[in-house]
Amino acid sequence: GVYCHATGFKILMDCKCGRGTKALETLKKIMPDSGKNPSSRSGAEPYVFTNCYSTNPGYYGKSYQSWTTGTSAWCMMGLYEGMMGIKRDYDGLRIVPCFPAAWEEAEATRHFRGADYHIVIRNPKHLEKGKPVITVDGSLCVGGPVNSSPCGDERRDDSLYAGGLVPAFGDGKTHEVEVLLSE
């Protein structure tokens, strides 16, 4: 059969290699009740990822173990940490998206270490991978040591290439984070 759990691994690797469009194509192949896997054939609930799909004649496309799988967790990680690029880091959230080229915008809200982060990622040039230029609460994140104002840069120099680090504020507030993918 087709083991779906590993699909999440492939999505993450596609994103690590800068292939956001491929990552989305892979995710769509195993989405519940999608064109490739209609619930009428698979027998799975239309809102639940399955562990695997059968390739045996007579059972082709039937799903197994839809409620006992890590597939949903790994695919969520592929979407959230891979495509949207929102990753936990020791110093805060690192946001380095790998978008499907067709995506112009995506947003998410993340609770992290005592604060909420409303994150909007914009991709007007339809890049799969670009340099994230980040603002937090209206202030541009620039290079410098991690705790300089207000964000750090993995390269720690004075360029505008924000290495994607948004600090962990831990203040109980909601912070507005805007990410612009640039060349």
Predicted regions and their residues:
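Generic helix N-cap/helix-start motif at coil->alpha-helix transitions
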Residues: 2-4, 41
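Non-catalytic C-terminal accessory modules of carbohydrate-active enzymes
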Residues: 9-147, 151, 157-183
